């Protein structure tokens, strides 16, 4: 456990309580570097095994990678097991060393955290300012571009994302290729154009909007009615 705690501290994860639970629960924002941290643990200490309910790592020469959760039943006896994207599946706490996740992106319940990180290395301060205006807590030291444009006047750039059925129908009629919400979790794109029929974030859709607004690295364009997107 000391290896894990020291690694979390060195990667700017903040401890929330003195007594760390078992499993150790780590909640973090998109782009906090959790996947990189997990891979570093795997490569530095052979006792660790990692399994994800998100997108698993591709096979590599070393054989040390984040595996799909479907292979959890094959974990070696005595391994220190890490669960990634813990909010997205079922697992037995008694068998787990640590669990990483982002309850803000999930509609399911989160767990009280032992460590947290609200600093993202993925996108920049302009997007963070927008998100914080809606009550999220996230910050960044890099710069990015965050624009709000009219739904029918915008020229899509980069990867197009949409999840509302009426929006997807419009995009399909105009032969615009797009990513749906079911395909974007854990993914990052250089630029994103997010199409929405809303001018704000409905409370019951906070998790979905948060996912769509946090997939980019350099530029986010929000295409919405009347080019207005702000807290209601």
From Swiss-Prot:
Keyword Protein transport part of the UniProt annotation = no
CC per GO annotation: host cell cytoplasm
Q: Which GO terms describe its biological process?
A: symbiont-mediated suppression of host innate immune response; transport of virus in host, cell to cell
Single GO term (MF) = ATP binding
Q: Which Pfam families match?
A: Viral_helicase1
Limits of the (+)RNA virus helicase C-terminal domain = 118-232
Chief place of localization:
host cell
What superkingdom does the record give? Viruses
Keywords recorded for this protein, A-Z: Host cytoplasm, Host-virus interaction, Inhibition of host innate immune response by virus, RNA-binding, Suppressor of RNA silencing, Transport, Viral immunoevasion, Viral movement protein
Localization terms from the record = Host cytoplasm
What's the further remark here? TGBp1, TGBp2 and TGBp3 seem to act together for cell-to-cell propagation. TGBp1 is the main movement protein that physically cross the plasmodesma with the viral genome. TGBp2 and TGBp3 would facilitate TGBp1 function.
Family of the protein in this entry: Belongs to the Tymovirales TGBp1 protein family.
* Protein role: Transports viral genome to neighboring plant cells directly through plasmosdesmata, without any budding. The movement protein allows efficient cell to cell propagation, by bypassing the host cell wall barrier. Increases plasmodesma size exclusion limit. Acts as a suppressor of RNA-mediated gene silencing, also known as post-transcriptional gene silencing (PTGS), a mechanism of plant viral defense that limits the accumulation of viral RNAs.
Q: How does it assemble?
A: Homodimer and homooligomer. Interacts with capsid protein. Interacts with host AGO1; this interaction targets the host protein for degradation, thereby suppressing the antiviral RNA silencing.
**Name of the protein:** Movement and silencing protein TGBp1
